[in-house]
Curated annotation (Swiss-Prot):
One of its GO terms (biological process) is microtubule-based process. GTP binds at Q12, D72, S141, G145, T146, T180, N207, N229. Signal peptide: none annotated. This is Tubulin alpha chain. Dimer of alpha and beta chains. A typical microtubule is a hollow water-filled tube with an outer diameter of 25 nm and an inner diameter of 15 nM. Alpha-beta heterodimers associate head-to-tail to form protofilaments running lengthwise along the microtubule wall with the beta-tubulin subunit facing the microtubule plus end conferring a structural polarity. Microtubules usually have 13 protofilaments but different protofilament numbers can be found in some organisms and specialized cells. It catalyses: GTP + H2O = GDP + phosphate + H(+).
């Protein structure tokens, strides 16, 4: 018994990411669209352990342990009428009547407050059905109203009710150039401030970086959100694959925190994935373990726009899937450490966590020319806690400052019952976060002044 994991998908970004993730899980476990075993499924290794993600009903159907919440009815109505309507439990699709209008305060204070008890109640019901609940995976965006506001509210409630369970977030982070809302910087800063204490580990993904990967590696001239989400789903799947399938080195949720988070506040690992390659090119490439490992350290394969060569790595988790043996993986790491461009902080000599899983990576089949991922024998996902991600925070803070210096758009937030002081408080917290990253990167780390903080 590996322990169950509950997926929470909040807001439009979380819901659409959820669709792609479950689409992939069904494929990996050999289940059809309605959650029943699909007789035509190939490559399925006796289905792995279903319990982690699915509840089995008495008539042999598998129901995802997942909850979809959005204050805006339309994304969830799409699930209710879409191809997977038979799959999800209708009680676990919760939609509001009016949306959060890209406003953190609406998601956190006014509209979100009315829904949160109902949502916690449903979570409790699913959690009570579990033998040993291991934790929560929370999918949301930092830029939208529901994702940022309601996401923060729900995490606050989860940490009071399920304090000991691990809470891992997948957060879609506002990209430098691609923006879906003017007030994204406000929402993201406010949301980060209120979740930083309540989340154990937050994997950041920014749309621009994933767009670039799709454009460059999959030759999709204009990637859609489906393309992006399928790529992110691969990473989500490899993070949880060792809970579901056998491997040489299994990794559970708590191990990510233990190995990736050196200080409670510095819990924002970067993710990268290799190989991202289209079916037309895959015949001409060799995917040796070492090459894949090196690819992960290329800025081109990372899911946040920042340059790790400017920072130092504190900890790295490499999760291999498919045909990989520990010896090759260790050799790849040794070769990597020998490269001069790879900087580890001095106070963390080993720096690497390995996971190896025998279940081969699968890709959702796509029409030729639609830029699907090529089926490959092995893949690697890398989660790395690097000080370079501070670049992403300082970009965000800069945008926040530009708007806040003129108090632009602030009245929308205050009108929903927020106090203006919360803006400056959140901004100070992020300034402190940037400073934390600076201190960690400084090699001569003075223990005595750092002790008061941690």
């Amino acid at each position: 018994m590996k322990g169950e994991i509950l997926h929470l998908h909040l807001g439009q970004a979380g819901t659409q990411l959820g669709n792609s993730a479950w689409e992939l899980y069904l494929l990996e476990h050999g289940l059809g669209h309605d959650g029943r075993p699909d007789p035509s499924a190939k490559d399925v290794v006796d289905g792995g352990s279903y319990e982690t993600f699915f509840t089995e009903t008495s008539n042999g159907k598998y129901v995802p342990r997942s909850l979809f919440v959005d204050l805006d009815p339309s994304p969830i109505d799409e699930i209710r009428t879409g191809g997977y309507r038979q799959l999800f439990h209708p009680e676990l699709l919760i939609s509001g009547k009016e949306d959060a209008a890209n406003n953190y305060a609406r998601g956190h204070y006014t509209i979100g407050k009315e829904m949160v008890d109902n949502v916690i109640d449903r979570i409790r019901r699913v959690a009570d059905n579990c033998h040993s609940l291991q934790g929560f995976l929370i999918f949301h965006s930092f830029g939208g109203g529901t994702g940022s506001g309601f996401g923060a509210l729900l995490l606050e409630r989860l940490s009071t009710e399920y304090g000991k369970k691990s809470k891992l977030e997948f957060a879609v982070y506002p990209a430098p150039r691609v923006s879906t809302a003017v007030v994204e910087p406000y929402n993201a800063v406010l949301s980060t401030h209120s979740t930083i204490e309540n989340s154990d580990c937050t994997f950041l993904v920014d749309n621009e970086a994933v767009y670039d990967i799709c454009r460059r590696n999959l030759d999709i001239p204009r990637p859609s959100y489906d393309h992006l989400n399928r790529l992110i789903a691969q990473v989500v799947s490899s993070i949880t694959s060792s809970l579901r399938f056998d491997g040489a080195l299994n990794v559970d949720l708590n191990e990510f925190q233990t190995n990736l988070v050196p200080y409670p506040r510095i819990h924002y690992p970067l993710i990268s994935y290799a190989p991202v390659i289209s079916a037309s090119k895959s015949a001409h490439e060799s995917f040796k373990v070492q090459e894949l490992t090196f690819q992960c350290f290329e800025p081109n394969n990372q899911m946040v726009v920042c340059d790790p060569r400017n920072g130092k790595y504190m900890a790295v988790a490499l999760l291999y899937r498919g045909d990989a043996v520990p010896r090759d993986c260790n050799a790849a790491i040794a070769a990597l450490k020998a490269k001069s461009s790879f900087n580890l902080v001095e106070w963390c000599p080993t720096g690497f966590k390995l996971g190896i899983n025998y279940q081969k990576p699968m890709a959702v089949p796509a029409a030729p020319g639609d830029g699907g991922l090529a089926p490959v024998d092995r893949s690697v996902s890398m989660l790395s806690n690097t000080t370079a991600i501070a670049e992403a925070w300082s970009r965000l803070d800069h945008k926040f400052d530009l708007m806040y210096s003129k108090r632009a758009f602030v009245h929308w937030y205050v009108g929903e019952g927020m106090e203006e002081g919360e803006f400056s408080e959140a901004r100070e917290d992020l300034a402190a976060l940037e400073k934390d990253y600076e201190e960690v990167a400084a090699d001569s780390y003075e223990g005595d002044e750092g002790e008061a903080e941690y």
